[in-house]
């Protein structure tokens, strides 16, 4: 799984380097799959999510013919299958100079992710990991814009137990691999999501995906 996660991080970074005004979502999606296979993946772990501008407000947006414009958010959510194991990573970038509101929102999501990763220890209830992310976003008055769970299990399938969601009492165990993917979404503005794969070990956690998490402005 570590290799699949590293591969996904490499692909998302190479894809960000290709973004430019006028490129279409489905062109980016096709490039992502090409880059995966070029690096040895047997294919994508799920249908790649590519969303520009207002469409980034859709957490599960599929690539369309929409062209990338200036001053738009870009959400890239992708995963690869390598050695039968799945990975899952999301990064959000901004085409242009991000306005203050986007910077604040991005910082809040990044802080929420860090809090959830810190909470994702062996023995922790999955609902408490989810709550850690929501508590941070509530501090920014953004929790109402977080419309999905914080994460899910990952392995031979892209969605497995445990669910990192509200009220989940199941406790994390060494050997679990989960995603941590808080996000905020607003119609007319777009969305911001940051996702990484986290392995739970006895006494520590390990982030398997390797790609910069800072706000990238193109």
Show the residue positions of the predicted features.
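Active-site neighborhoods and metal-handling regions in enzymes and metal-associated proteins
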Residues: 1-218
């Amino acid at each position: 799984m570590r290799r699949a996660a590293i591969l996904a991080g490499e692909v998302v970074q190479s894809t960000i380097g290709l973004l430019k005004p006028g490129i279409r979502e489905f062109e980016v999606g096709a490039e992502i799959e090409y880059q995966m296979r070029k690096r040895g993946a047997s294919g994508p772990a799920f249908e790649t999510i590519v969303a520009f501008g207002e469409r980034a407000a859709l957490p599960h947006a599929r690539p369309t013919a929409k062209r990338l414009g200036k001053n738009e958010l870009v959400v890239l959510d992708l995963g690869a299958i390598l050695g039968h194991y799945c990975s899952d990573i999301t990064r959000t970038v901004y085409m242009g100079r991000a306005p203050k509101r986007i910077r604040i929102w991005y910082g809040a999501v990044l802080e929420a992710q860090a809090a959830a990763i810190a909470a994702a220890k062996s023995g922790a209830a999955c609902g408490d990991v989810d709550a850690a992310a929501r508590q941070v976003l509530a501090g920014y008055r953004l929790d109402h814009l977080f419309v999905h769970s914080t994460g899910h299990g990952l392995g031979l399938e892209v969605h497995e137990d445990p669910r990192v969601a509200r009220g989940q009492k199941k406790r994390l165990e060494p050997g679990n691999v989960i995603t941590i993917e808080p996000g905020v979404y607003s119609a007319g503005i777009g969305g911001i999501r940051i996702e990484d794969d986290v392995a739970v070990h006895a006494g520590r956690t390990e982030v398997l995906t390797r790609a910069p998490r800072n706000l990238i402005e193109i």
